[in-house]
C-alpha cells in the first residue's frame, strides 16, 4: 500500500551552486511537507511561498519560472522533474535567491538529494490527473499533445536544424526507476552562437561547460562528450516531465511532443486544466482503490518497498 500513498522527503537536505541565467550563488534545500501540501517553492530571503502549479507560471523564456506577490523562482523544471520522477508528492523547496542552482545541468543531482534524504510515506492517498480525451497545442511544425494512456509516458522529437540534432527522438514510460536510469542524467544544452546573444539579454550568466552541453557548428565542445547518443532529446523529455509536474500531481496519460518548449508545455497544461471533459482527478483513498487504479496505471506504483 505504501507505494499508493503520498510521499515526502524524510529529512532536510541541501545543495549549493549557481543560477544558470542569473549567475548568482544559490542554496537549495528539500524539506519534508505534510500530506496534500504538494510541492511549494519558498523564497527564504523574502518569506514568500509559491505553490508549484501552472497558475503560478510567470515566464517560460528558456526555462520555467514561478512567481507570486512579486517574488519569483526561475529554472524550476529540473528539480520538479526529479521530484516527480522520484515519486515525491509533498515537499518544501527552499531557495535563498531568485533561481534554482543549475548544478551539472541535469536532474541527477536532485535525484541524489532525494536519495540522501530518504522517503517518508504520508497518511493520505496519492492523487492522479487522468487524461480522458486528447488535448493538443500546435504552432506550425511544433506540437504538444496529451492523450489517454496507461501509465505516464513522454515521447519527444527534437530538430534544431543542426547536424548533431536533426530528427532526434526519445520515448520513456515512467515507473520502475526509469527516470533515474534513462532521463535524469541528460544535461541542458545550448549553441555557441547563441551564448553572446543570451548574455546580452541578461541570461546564461552562470553557464559553462560544467553545467551545459555547448555545441558549435559541427561538434560538441565539452571534452567528455555526451552521456547518451540522444542526450538532447532525453533532456527535452526531462524538461517536459518537469513542466507537466506543474499539474500538481502525477499524470496518467501520454505526452507526444515535437519541437515543443516550456511555453508550449505550459499552454498544454493550462488547456487540459480548463477542459473538465478532458481530465479527471482520482485519489487513492485506501488499499481497496489500488487494484482498480493499478489496472489503469500499472507503471505508477514506483519505488515499491523503498520508502521508510
Curated annotation (Swiss-Prot):
PANTHER family: UDP-3-O-ACYL-N-ACETYLGLUCOSAMINE DEACETYLASE 1, MITOCHONDRIAL-RELATED
Annotated binding of Zn(2+), by residue: 78, 235, 239
Enzyme class: hydrolase
Pathway involvement of the protein, from the record: Glycolipid biosynthesis; lipid IV(A) biosynthesis; lipid IV(A) from (3R)-3-hydroxytetradecanoyl-[acyl-carrier-protein] and UDP-N-acetyl-alpha-D-glucosamine: step 2/6
Active-site residue numbers: 262
Function per UniProt: Catalyzes the hydrolysis of UDP-3-O-myristoyl-N-acetylglucosamine to form UDP-3-O-myristoylglucosamine and acetate, the committed step in lipid A biosynthesis.
UniProtKB keywords: Hydrolase, Lipid A biosynthesis, Lipid biosynthesis, Lipid metabolism, Metal-binding, Zinc
Superkingdom field: Bacteria
Listed EC numbers: 3.5.1.108
UniProt GO molecular function: metal ion binding; UDP-3-O-acyl-N-acetylglucosamine deacetylase activity
Catalytic activity annotation: a UDP-3-O-[(3R)-3-hydroxyacyl]-N-acetyl-alpha-D-glucosamine + H2O = a UDP-3-O-[(3R)-3-hydroxyacyl]-alpha-D-glucosamine + acetate
Organism of derivation: Anaeromyxobacter dehalogenans (strain 2CP-C)
Cofactors: Zn(2+)
Matches recorded under InterPro entries: Ribosomal_Su5_D2-typ_SF (IPR020568), UDP-acyl_GlcNac_deAcase (IPR004463), UDP-acyl_GlcNac_deAcase_C (IPR011334), UDP-acyl_N-AcGlcN_deAcase_N (IPR015870)
Family: Belongs to the LpxC family.
UniProt GO BP: lipid A biosynthetic process
GO CC terms of this entry: membrane
Gene3D superfamilies: lpxc deacetylase, domain 1, lpxc deacetylase, domain 2
SUPFAM superfamilies: Ribosomal protein S5 domain 2-like
The protein's name in its UniProt record: UDP-3-O-acyl-N-acetylglucosamine deacetylase
Gene transcribed to yield this protein: lpxC
Keyword field contains Zinc: yes
